[in-house]
Protein backbone atom coordinates (compact mmCIF):
# COMPACT_ATOMS: atom_id res chain seq x y z
CA UNK A 1 0.00 0.00 0.00
CA UNK A 2 1.14 3.52 -0.67
CA UNK A 3 1.45 6.16 2.00
CA UNK A 4 -1.46 8.04 0.36
CA UNK A 5 -3.64 4.92 0.54
CA UNK A 6 -2.79 4.48 4.21
CA UNK A 7 -3.66 8.12 4.91
CA UNK A 8 -6.92 7.93 2.92
CA UNK A 9 -7.92 4.76 4.77
CA UNK A 10 -7.18 6.37 8.15
CA UNK A 11 -9.22 9.47 7.27
CA UNK A 12 -12.10 7.32 6.00
CA UNK A 13 -12.01 5.20 9.16
CA UNK A 14 -12.08 8.37 11.26
CA UNK A 15 -15.22 9.57 9.47
CA UNK A 16 -16.90 6.17 9.58
CA UNK A 17 -16.07 5.45 13.22
CA UNK A 18 -16.45 8.89 14.79
CA UNK A 19 -18.33 11.02 12.22
CA UNK A 20 -15.48 13.54 12.31
CA UNK A 21 -13.42 14.85 9.44
CA UNK A 22 -16.32 15.13 7.00
CA UNK A 23 -20.06 15.06 6.59
CA UNK A 24 -22.57 12.22 6.79
CA UNK A 25 -25.83 12.05 4.87
CA UNK A 26 -28.55 9.43 4.59
CA UNK A 27 -31.15 8.70 1.97
CA UNK A 28 -34.89 8.97 2.49
CA UNK A 29 -35.14 5.20 2.81
CA UNK A 30 -32.65 5.11 5.67
CA UNK A 31 -34.33 8.06 7.40
CA UNK A 32 -37.65 6.21 7.15
CA UNK A 33 -36.22 3.47 9.39
CA UNK A 34 -36.67 5.87 12.32
CA UNK A 35 -34.22 7.68 14.56
CA UNK A 36 -33.50 4.76 16.91
CA UNK A 37 -32.77 2.42 14.00
CA UNK A 38 -30.58 5.06 12.37
CA UNK A 39 -28.56 5.37 15.59
CA UNK A 40 -28.05 1.60 15.64
CA UNK A 41 -27.14 1.66 11.94
CA UNK A 42 -24.54 4.38 12.45
CA UNK A 43 -23.03 2.31 15.28
CA UNK A 44 -22.97 -0.74 13.00
CA UNK A 45 -21.15 1.22 10.30
CA UNK A 46 -18.66 2.48 12.89
CA UNK A 47 -17.62 -1.07 13.77
CA UNK A 48 -17.90 -2.49 10.23
CA UNK A 49 -14.70 -4.37 9.39
CA UNK A 50 -15.66 -6.73 6.55
CA UNK A 51 -13.38 -5.04 4.02
CA UNK A 52 -11.98 -7.33 1.34
CA UNK A 53 -10.75 -7.12 -2.24
CA UNK A 54 -14.31 -7.54 -3.53
CA UNK A 55 -15.69 -4.46 -1.77
CA UNK A 56 -12.45 -2.54 -1.08
CA UNK A 57 -10.13 -3.13 -4.05
CA UNK A 58 -8.03 -0.02 -3.35
CA UNK A 59 -7.76 -0.56 0.40
CA UNK A 60 -9.35 2.80 1.24
CA UNK A 61 -12.30 1.56 3.37
CA UNK A 62 -14.58 3.80 1.28
CA UNK A 63 -17.43 1.32 0.69
CA UNK A 64 -19.31 -1.35 2.58
CA UNK A 65 -22.49 -3.37 2.31
CA UNK A 66 -24.28 -5.57 4.81
CA UNK A 67 -27.72 -6.54 6.06
CA UNK A 68 -29.13 -4.48 8.90
CA UNK A 69 -32.31 -5.68 10.61
CA UNK A 70 -33.41 -7.36 7.38
CA UNK A 71 -32.57 -4.43 5.08
CA UNK A 72 -29.62 -4.49 2.66
CA UNK A 73 -27.51 -1.41 3.46
CA UNK A 74 -24.65 0.27 1.63
CA UNK A 75 -22.36 3.09 2.63
CA UNK A 76 -19.80 4.94 0.57
CA UNK A 77 -17.36 7.76 1.13
CA UNK A 78 -16.74 10.27 -1.64
CA UNK A 79 -13.99 12.88 -1.84
CA UNK A 80 -14.86 16.42 -2.91
CA UNK A 81 -13.02 19.71 -3.02
CA UNK A 82 -13.70 21.99 -0.03
CA UNK A 83 -16.53 23.76 -1.91
CA UNK A 84 -18.24 20.43 -2.71
CA UNK A 85 -18.22 21.28 -6.42
CA UNK A 86 -15.66 18.85 -7.83
CA UNK A 87 -13.69 15.76 -6.88
CA UNK A 88 -10.87 16.38 -4.45
CA UNK A 89 -7.50 17.08 -6.04
CA UNK A 90 -5.89 14.94 -3.31
CA UNK A 91 -8.06 12.71 -1.08
CA UNK A 92 -5.08 12.10 1.22
CA UNK A 93 -4.98 15.81 2.15
CA UNK A 94 -7.80 16.96 4.46
CA UNK A 95 -6.87 20.59 3.79
CA UNK A 96 -8.24 20.25 0.23
CA UNK A 97 -10.80 17.48 0.76
CA UNK A 98 -14.33 17.30 2.11
CA UNK A 99 -15.34 13.70 2.79
CA UNK A 100 -19.00 12.74 2.50
CA UNK A 101 -20.27 9.48 3.97
CA UNK A 102 -23.55 8.43 2.32
CA UNK A 103 -25.69 5.77 4.01
CA UNK A 104 -28.38 4.18 1.85
CA UNK A 105 -30.61 1.21 1.33
CA UNK A 106 -29.06 -0.95 -1.40
CA UNK A 107 -32.18 -0.45 -3.53
CA UNK A 108 -31.54 3.30 -3.53
CA UNK A 109 -28.13 3.01 -5.21
Where do the language-model regions lie?
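Short, compact, well-ordered microdomains
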Residues: 63-109
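Compact soluble domain cores
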Residues: 2-67
Amino acid sequence: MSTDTDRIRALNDQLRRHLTGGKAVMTHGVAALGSEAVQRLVQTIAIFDDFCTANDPHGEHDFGSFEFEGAPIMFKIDYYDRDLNFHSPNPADPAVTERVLTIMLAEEY
